[in-house]
Amino acid sequence: MSSKSSLELANNAVKSNDIEKAIDLYKEVLNKGVSKDEKVANEQEQALTNLSDLYVRENRHNDLAQLVQQSRPLMANFSKAKSAKIVRTLIDKFSGEKKSLPLQIEVANDCIKWAIKEKRTFLRQALETKLISLYYDNSSYTDAINLINTLLSELKRMDDKMLLTEVHLLESKVYHAIRNIPKARASLTAAKTSANAVYCPPMLQGNLDLQSGILHADDMDFKTAYSYFYEAYEGFTSLDDDKKALSSLKYMLLSQIMLNSVSEVKSLLTGKHAIRYAGRDIEAMRAIAQAHENRSLADFEKALQDYKPELASDPIIRSHLSSLYDNLLEQNLLRVVEPFSRVEVSHIAELIGLSTVQVEGKLSQMILDKIFYGILDQGSGCLIVYDEPQQDKTYEAALEVIKNMGTVVDLLIENKASALL
């Protein structure tokens, strides 16, 4: 049986859902060993790709990890650049689920050791860049920063602009995750500087735009953030990366909601963008936009509850919705409290549909922040509201007169002293 026929039979077995037979046939192709025949090498590459896809489809992550290890002898069939691409592709095949990350990190570390042994510097650097990304996804930020520092010093000596761009971008994302915003900005600037010196692939440019938008949103500059998110969305859409395009679209909607641009939000929700990515994620943002427009805490909380997986899973969305909820709660409390000089906290809670504990906590914070003036009487369970104290201008005027008189007296003393001399 020739390698070609084995590959064809394996593909047919996949189509007929005979999984075990397909796996055996793909392995038969791979077990032919190292060959200088280009045709055989191409068939082995195809078998490797198809078998890895099959393992992914069947959620057989351990088998995929073994395949990565067992395929190393075949790398002699390919150029160093091609073998590096194959190894990275195989690691990327793992599911993006959180539970598969430890195995993926283990496989990446194992491949790095192999690359060091084989003295494949370019492959090792590419794998270390991938490992940083995995550490970031796994929230192993200390490990990520340690590896970033080591890799950056090496890449700067080699002046590899492309990898420098990728690593600086990852550095920005890691620092943003640990809320070191100044370093996140500095890293992003470094990434853009490196990117300007070389051709920047659309995917990398999209990721740079996305990170730029996220940092501008953190500065509450949602107008600029929207522009970057739109650029990222256009880039990811052209690459058919639906997952990242959808995230960018959600951030675009979030920016317009935070800007209180009702017409822009409605335009986005009814336009071609929302139609293409219609689903629960877009409906979640629609519900948030509607609740914000109506200034309704009840609708806002209902949206957060009904679309919890879509809204809570994204830390960027979650962070800004928390800020939006706080602002909405403050506005509702101010509107309710305004007519009263003394009111029971339980009555306020009943009017806005929240628990007494929640309302009391928020009122305390607002008083401390001087959003309004008052005290909480714990004994009676009441909020006592005061008028904003007016500063008496007399004291300021008196202090100014005393200051001027002091200046005049000092000058008189100086003049008298000069005359005596």
From Swiss-Prot:
Entry keyword Repeat? no
**The organism of origin for this protein:** Schizosaccharomyces pombe (strain 972 / ATCC 24843)
GO MF term list: structural molecule activity
| Keyword field | Proteasome
| Function noted in UniProt | Component of the lid subcomplex of the 26S proteasome, a multiprotein complex involved in the ATP-dependent degradation of ubiquitinated proteins. In the complex, rpn6 is required for proteasome assembly.
Gene3D superfamilies documented for this protein: 1.25.40.570
**Residue ranges annotated for the PCI domain, each copy included:** 221-390
Query: Which family does the record assign?
Result: Belongs to the proteasome subunit S9 family.
Q: What protein name does the entry list?
A: Probable 26S proteasome regulatory subunit rpn6
Please give the superkingdom of this protein's source: Eukaryota
**Sorted alphabetically, which Pfam families does this protein's record hold?**
PCI (PF01399), RPN6_C_helix (PF18503), RPN6_N (PF18055)
**Entry's SMART domains?**
PAM, PINT
Instruction: State the encoding gene.
Output: rpn6
Note the subunit structure.
Answer: Component of the lid subcomplex of the 19S proteasome regulatory particle complex (also named PA700 complex). The 26S proteasome consists of a 20S proteasome core and two 19S regulatory subunits.
| Cellular component per GO, a single term | cytosol
One GO process term, biological-process aspect = proteasome-mediated ubiquitin-dependent protein catabolic process
Leader sequence segment: none
